[in-house]
Amino acid sequence: MTTLRAFTCDDLFRFNNINLDPLTETYGIPFYLQYLAHWPEYFIVAEAPGGELMGYIMGKAEGSVAREEWHGHVTALSVAPEFRRLGLAAKLMELLEEISERKGGFFVDLFVRVSNQVAVNMYKQLGYSVYRTVIEYYSASNGEPDEDAYDMRKALSRDTEKKSIIPLPHPVRPEDIE
């Protein structure tokens, strides 16, 4: 049986198999530790019965309550290739959404590469919609051009009028994101 539990510092030494996917954004250890220190409830790992890490979600709470922009943000969601297509990503997203509801969020958002249609379709199946396109959000390597991202959102129960998911009519640049 899969165990969903809080991510711990020790997991930083055990999750490389998950991060090997070329579509997974990886960060330095201080970045992960910052999330672990500031938003531990938003950092969840899935562990197989034998102790192998299957996947994780890392997020945070951010935004302005006064402007109805307080929300949960998915910084990273990744599942090891051998554990995909089992509903694990959906379960991790559901947990982050529940935490965001309890924290009084208006919505949950995330950024995803426009080219990652598998992920885009999964998020749409989970109730997310494209709020805006962010031009050249992802930096490329090997001389490739930078890649655009979709900022996808799902309204939570506090956003009764679903204002947070009304799509913007034009793309934005990364520096225009608050």
Swiss-Prot record:
GO MF assignments: protein N-terminal-methionine acetyltransferase activity; protein-N-terminal amino-acid acetyltransferase activity
UniProt keyword annotation of Acyltransferase present: yes
UniProt-listed InterPro entries: Acyl_CoA_acyltransferase, GNAT_dom, NatB_acetyltransferase_subunit
Localisation: Cytoplasm; Nucleus
Enzyme class, first EC level, given as a word: transferase
BP terms from Gene Ontology: N-terminal peptidyl-aspartic acid acetylation; N-terminal peptidyl-glutamic acid acetylation; N-terminal peptidyl-glutamine acetylation; N-terminal protein amino acid acetylation; regulation of actin cytoskeleton organization
Impact when changing residue 80 to V: In MRT73; strong decrease in N-acetylation catalytic activity in vitro for substrates Met-Glu, Met-Asn and Met-Gln, but not Met-Asp; does not affect protein stability
Entries under Pfam families matching the protein: Acetyltransf_1
Catalytic activity: N-terminal L-methionyl-L-asparaginyl-[protein] + acetyl-CoA = N-terminal N(alpha)-acetyl-L-methionyl-L-asparaginyl-[protein] + CoA + H(+); N-terminal L-methionyl-L-glutaminyl-[protein] + acetyl-CoA = N-terminal N(alpha)-acetyl-L-methionyl-L-glutaminyl-[protein] + CoA + H(+); N-terminal L-methionyl-L-aspartyl-[protein] + acetyl-CoA = N-terminal N(alpha)-acetyl-L-methionyl-L-aspartyl-[protein] + CoA + H(+); N-terminal L-methionyl-L-glutamyl-[protein] + acetyl-CoA = N-terminal N(alpha)-acetyl-L-methionyl-L-glutamyl-[protein] + CoA + H(+)
Keywords from the named record: Acyltransferase, Cytoplasm, Disease variant, Intellectual disability, Nucleus, Transferase
Effect of residue 54 to V: In MRT73; decreased complex formation with NAA25 and decreased N-acetylation catalytic activity in vitro for all 4 types of substrates; does not affect protein stability
Annotated GO CC locations: cytoplasm; cytosol; NatB complex; nucleus
Annotated N-acetyltransferase domain residues: 2-157
EC numbers for this chain: 2.3.1.254
Domain of life: Eukaryota
Disorder named in the UniProt entry: Intellectual developmental disorder, autosomal recessive 73: A form of intellectual disability, a disorder characterized by significantly below average general intellectual functioning associated with impairments in adaptive behavior and manifested during the developmental period. MRT73 patients manifest global developmental delay with hypotonia and mildly delayed walking, impaired intellectual development with poor or absent speech, and mildly dysmorphic features.
Similarity-based family: Belongs to the acetyltransferase family. ARD1 subfamily.
Function of the molecule: Catalytic subunit of the NatB complex which catalyzes acetylation of the N-terminal methionine residues of peptides beginning with Met-Asp, Met-Glu, Met-Asn and Met-Gln. Proteins with cell cycle functions are overrepresented in the pool of NatB substrates. Required for maintaining the structure and function of actomyosin fibers and for proper cellular migration.
Subunit structure: Component of the N-terminal acetyltransferase B (NatB) complex which is composed of NAA20 and NAA25.
Name this polypeptide is given: N-alpha-acetyltransferase 20
Species assigned in the record: Homo sapiens
Gene: NAA20
